[in-house]
Amino acid sequence: MLDLTRLLPGPAAALRLAELGADVLKIEAPGAGDPTRTMMQSSSDRVAGRPGAFYRMVNRGKRETRLDLKSEAGRNVLRALAAEADVLIESFRPGVMERLGLGYATLSAANPRLVYCAISGYGASGPFADHAGHDLNYIGYAGVLDQLASRDGAPIVPNFQIADLLGGALSAVTQILAALWHVARGGAGRFVDVSMTHTSYAHNFVAQVSLLNEGAAPAAGSGLLNGGVPCYNLYRTSDERWLAVGALELKFWETLCMALDRPEWATRHWSLGQAIGGPDALALIRELAEVIATRTLGEWVESLESLDCCVSPVLTPAEAAQHPLFNPHAYAAVAASAADSDDDGA
């Protein structure tokens, strides 16, 4: 597999395929190479002259080489590599590879089984095909960012790149695997066109259901899954931490109400007619918030985590990294491997 991508979406897609067993060759331009080499780079990495953790994390498990695709010699090398490859993935702006003489039509003529994946912000064709953008722009156009708003209506800047990772990386992985299966069954290769904006839009199911049913997506704090019911909400604890209550189904809500010694709350549930975002729902949110505010996060976790009621702590990334759920020893080994990899590949 040839990985010509940079930044996050393409490298993450290639990483996931490498984890599944693909032999990935990362190809970078001479000089600075992939911008993530220095993006969020620590001072110790700069002093040591090695790429930052971001680069090492999303490019681990790959071989690496440099090619100048602006030179005929570099393009000839890539053509030779593509003639033997199963997959090529790139994230240039649409049209760049064609202008270099390295587009799908050219490369597939020499290798009809080639699966060629192009990840872009707005797709290989259409009115925005040549527009620049990043994750925030893509989820903005897709109607996703609007749904990540606080109660005052102000959208947040999420530190989880939804379009890059869901719209770009995971969509690329699934489509590449489907294309490879087609080839394995005797079919020809495929051009896989991944638009991060369109794939993000396609996954915005809940908002689109409300749009169909009611003519508008729910404002923050007014829908079933965005804070409009007490059984599916976030609550502040006495130590200024947060508890996630996901007791969406009645049986989980009933268990939670009994654990809180509030059995009378069990009938105040959306499935029993409580209006979502209505007066009773908002009142019960306030009542439950008062109860949760009486104890620390640790105390709530100790008393509720073992119960079958879908309640969990809101952990920081540092806490999550040490949680038994994620097998910290295995993750530490991965991190150590990334830290030990040098500039010549992982």
Please identify what each model-predicted range represents:
Residues 23-27, 305-319:
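Short, well-structured beta-strand/strand-turn elements
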Residues 1-185, 287, 334-335:
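N-terminal helix-loop segment corresponding to the beta1-alpha1 unit
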Residues 37-42, 213-220:
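Short Pro/Gly-enriched beta-strand edge/turn motifs at strand-loop
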Residues 124, 153-162, 184-200, 216, ...:
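Conserved Rossmann-fold dehydrogenase catalytic segment
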Residues 31, 121-123, 196-201, 239-241, ...:
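Glycine-rich beta-alpha junction loops
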Residues 142, 168-189, 202, 206-214, ...:
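Oxidoreductase and adenylate-handling cofactor-binding alpha/beta cores
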